[in-house]
A protein has these predicted regions:
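Hydrophobic membrane-anchoring helix/hairpin
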Residues: 5-114
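Amphipathic, coiled-coil-like alpha-helical scaffolding segments used for oligomerization/assembly
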Residues: 67, 78, 98-162
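Long, charge-rich amphipathic alpha-helical coiled-coil "stalk/tentacle" segments
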Residues: 161-170
Length: 170
């Protein structure tokens, strides 16, 4: 017992959930999630712990508007995994779901939406519409992948230096 003592429990902190992997059994238990506190298990099994608090990640997506003008959106993605579905998330995507799923998906969706607007529309009256479309598409795509997108915030719209120079010279 002394030898295996530290390998027989995991202390799950507030804002975390755990899923258990049975090495000699059926593998990952996707049905049960473990909450905060000390959780015991046999030493050959493993507890995988996920942070389920709301998180924010900054991302920049480079693309072209409907006229082919190079522009970029700097965005903040506010998200968290679905607490009771982290076993499924771990089984289908893994612990690095931000890099494997969220970042590629925001890139694809933002590029698709950006090219439907002109740069002038993006910086003026259509910015909120653009944000809302990206947000709704992300929510729909990732809900079935066990991730909740709370909000997408556009923090900056960036254009190429040549275009910016031409605008300031006018």
């Amino acid at each position: 017992l002394f030898i295996f003592g530290s390998q027989m429990y995991t202390n799950i902190q507030p804002g975390q959930k755990g899923v258990k992997f049975y090495t000699l059994g059926d593998g990952l238990d996707t049905e049960i999630t473990y909450g905060q506190g000390m959780n015991f298990y046999l030493p050959w099994n493993k507890m995988i712990v996920y942070d389920v608090k709301t998180q924010m990640h900054a991302v920049q997506v480079d693309g072209k508007d409907t006229n082919g003008v190079q522009c970029a959106l700097a965005m903040n993605i506010i998200y968290h995994p679905v607490e009771d579905e982290i076993g499924l998330l771990h089984n289908e995507v893994g612990e690095d779901y931000l890099n494997k799923l969220i970042k590629p998906k925001i890139g694809d969706i933002a590029l698709t939406v950006i090219k439907e607007y002109t740069y002038d529309e993006i910086i003026s009256n259509k910015k909120d519409e653009l944000k809302l479309r990206i947000e709704k598409m992300m929510q729909a795509e990732l809900a079935e992948r066990h991730i909740i997108i709370e909000e997408i915030k556009i923090s900056d719209i960036i254009i190429s230096a040549d275009i910016e120079k031409a605008i300031t010279e006018k």
